[in-house]
Amino acid sequence: MAMSGTFHLTSDYVPGYTLSDSRCFFNSAVSRRTLAILPCSSCLDHKNGRLKSVPNRSSFVCRASSGGYRRNPDFSRLNKHGYRGNNRQSGGREDFDIENSDMLSSRNGPLFNLSSSPKFQATSSPGPREKEIVELFRKVQAQLRARAAAKKEEKKIEEASKGQGKESETVDSLLKLLRKHSGEQSKRQVSKFSSQGEVQGDTVDKQDRTGNLVTSGNKDNNASSFTRPTSSFRRKSPVPRSQSPPAYSSEATFDQSSSYSVTWTQKKDTVELHDEPEHEPAYEHEHEPENESEPGPVTTMLEPDSELKPESSSFYQEEEDDDVTFDVLSQDDGILDVLSDDDESLDDADEDSDEAEEEAVKDLSELKLVELRGIAKSRGLKGLSKMKKAELVELLGSDSS
């Protein structure tokens, strides 16, 4: 308790304080009694002390401070030695103390009450400032609680948003996987279709190739059938056989299937054309429809072209044009008879061929180019494809001479 100053004690009872000790000393016929007031917060007991004053009524001074009390050296000495005659004088002092207390009370006024100080009141009941502080503290606590609740709500919202984000991420990943799977399936289907299309294309190509081969074979067969049809036509020449017998080559062969093929050379054609009259083609055209109705087996012979224009073609092509092969097919027995007749006439043709050639040489200038070439080939001459008619006539004339 920080308190300093001078005051007069008029009461023998001071609450919250105790009297440590009391000694009485006499100086110049004055008896004084000092009080040492010490704070005692732990105990509630109070001791009563009475003040004694000298007859001249002189008051005593009590000073108190926060640092404690200052001891009077005289008072400390008195405390050491003590009052030996305190008990002896106690009876006489009581009356004097009562009188002094009355005098002090009348002089100093009302009693000094320490409980009325503001610090005792502050400890007993809170003041307005303390109430304001408590209210402010409560407000701060409420604000802090509100902030904590808001933070918790924000955390919950963030967690919910994160959960939604995770869900959206999972959904996106699933969509990506599904898209990849669908793309792979589409690629596989496309590859399968392409492979099937390639296989089908290969099969179609194979079928086309086989079809082309078959059609080409059929065309060849048809061409062969059209180029060499079986015919029962027999050409009747007005020229007797004895004068101009046909000369067959030794290459004629007979097949087992009752068919034979005879190769005619240009020589034979030229001899027959030379012996036949000029009106033979018209005669043939006139008698062709009548002979077609005849069922008998005959042989066919193609005539060479009436005129042959000189062209810059190879020697082999001309030989192919000159050589014409005929295949006559027949199943009747008459064909064998014709063959036997032809075989008999071969010998006669060989004998008469020399005579026919001698007669033909006389009129070489009247013959055509094709006929001249046939004669030259029959004589074994070569390199005739590029020669003209005059050159051939000279060659044949020089050869015959």
UniProtKB/Swiss-Prot annotation:
Chain intervals with Polar residues compositional bias: 102-126, 210-223, 240-265
UniProt-annotated location(s): Plastid, Chloroplast
One MF term in the entry's GO annotations: rRNA binding
Acidic residues bias: start-end ranges: 339-358
One Pfam family matching this protein: Rho_N
InterPro entries hit by this protein: Rho-like_N
Biased amino acid composition, Basic and acidic residues: 266-290
Region (Disordered): 73-129, 180-361
Disruption phenotype: Smaller and albinotic phenotype. Increased number and decreased size of chloroplasts. Seedling lethal when homozygous.
Any single GO BP term: DNA-templated transcription termination
Keywords: Chloroplast, Coiled coil, Plastid, RNA-binding, Transit peptide
Coiled coil location: 339-371
Organelle transit peptide residues: 1-63
GO cellular component, one term: chloroplast
Subunit structure: Homodimer or homomultimer. Part of a chloroplastic degradosome-like complex. Interacts with RNE.
Function text: Binds to and supports processing of specific plastid RNAs. Associates via its C-terminal Rho-N domain to single stranded regions of 16S and 23S rRNAs or to rbcL mRNAs. May be involved in targeting transcripts to RNases such as RNE or RNase J.
PANTHER family found in the cross-reference section: RHO TERMINATION FACTOR, RHO-N DOMAIN-CONTAINING PROTEIN 1, CHLOROPLASTIC
Record's protein name: Rho-N domain-containing protein 1, chloroplastic
